[in-house]
Amino acid sequence: MLENWSTVYDLEKIINDIFILHKNNNNKKFSTNILISGKSGIGKTQILDQICKKNNLKLKVVQAYQYGEFITGLPLVNNDITKFTKAEWVQEVLDENPDVIMFDDAHLIRSEYLNHFYETLTFRIFQSTQLNKNSIFVLIGNWGIDAAFFNDIPLPIMSRMNYIFKFEPNLNKWIEWGLNNNIDKRIINYLSYFKDEFIINSDVNEIVISPRNWEYFSEALKNGLQLDYFDTCLGVKIGNKFKDFLLVLDKSLDELLTLAKDKNLKESEKIAIIVALGNYDNAYKNKSITDYISSLNDDRIVLWITIISQKYKMEDNYKEILEFKKYIQKQFPSIYEVYNK
């Protein structure tokens, strides 16, 4: 499986196809320039990195601020003659001869350097230095409503793009990626129900939450982040909600089933009970658990089924997955068809 976060369309497949078309374009009459735009922290850079690795393509990442700040290189004075070294990134590109050159955070290229950038995109020339004409150029950035108040992409640059993509992360794909990349299981379990919290804008929460936040939060949890500091990663509202969720997960089976009778539970605590019962060993074979789950509405039952499925996938326990599917088909036939898909 390709390890990345996917878009609402299959972006990795499309870019793979573009790379193949470029490779088969023997005369290279036209350069291949790709623009991938979207909000910060949603995995634009990672998806390109993983696609290049999958296709054994050498990738060179150029940070956009380097393009402007080092456009002339460093001055070398010899008597009365001053020459300039090649910009550092240009020399690296010449030395490494990459298949793909990615300009990360391309919206940071200062407007006074856009003419030079246009020349680079069109002719693969930078300050009279010829770059590899066969290299694919990929611009990664945030434009339009995602611009974060930096430069909008001007029309001449846009006209040089052969392919333009608006990147939107997909939670289901991210969860699939997370199961294979050691994202904390409790985060995956939480987002399996609270799907609207995968991405949150600042007008809803004190801080913007993106897939990158959840990835950083996962690392912080593994490194022993204390409960009192959850709000530094997720904001006060979501941080406290996740804290309530987490505290329930550590309870014993008897404590969980007793707590489930409490009429004053918060929503996050109710969901945590279902998650904890899903992660219990042989959960679907335990009558006290299945009796409680059977009393719930369908969306809560689906969550419980999802948690058990995720657990078996992480364990590579395919034998148990098959047995569990048989159980669902027998006990919840109306849900089985959706689950099986």
Regions inferred by a protein language model and the residue ranges of each:
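C-terminal regulatory/interaction module of P-loop NTP-utilizing enzymes
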Residues: 1-101, 105-341
